[in-house]
Amino acid sequence: MIRCGIGYDVHRLAKGRKLILGGMEVAHSRGLEGHSDADVLSHAITDALLGAIGAGDIGQHFPNTDESIRGISSIEILKRVTKLLAEKKTRVVNIDATIIAEAPKLAPHIAEMRKIIADAIGIPNSNVSVKATTNEKLGAIGRDEGIAAMAVATVEQE
């Protein structure tokens, strides 16, 4: 059976943090606040995958009250969720994701993000789409207060 899930995440930008998107560090004057590495792209994909199998959301599986996972790599979270999918006899078919940010420019990093995500999930790069757009200076994202991401995951369950 083919199933689909959708995910969304947003984090505030803060000084003194590294900006991690799609599992890679992107040069920027600020990074994203969060309990983990705050990688909004990986978090949105994680939620899409969990949604596709009806398994709740990232906060249920990796709560921000769990000090044992403080600072965890969001790529590690993706790997753990992929293992959960395999236990449920489900394979990832496709990921389509969009990052919404005023800065920095992300186009030069998209190919590497796709590779890191595809490797974490165990699918070909061609099955992972990552796009970037701005919020046209509207709202908190448009004022460069944070970065958001949304994702759709298609999975096949036996």
Model-derived features: where do they sit?
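The alpha-helix within a helix-turn-helix
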Residues: 118
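Active-site phosphate/pyrophosphate- and oxyanion-stabilizing loops and adjacent acidic/basic residues
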Residues: 115
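RNase III-family endoribonuclease catalytic core
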Residues: 1-112, 121
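C-terminal binding/interaction regions
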Residues: 3, 94, 104-107, 123-142, ...
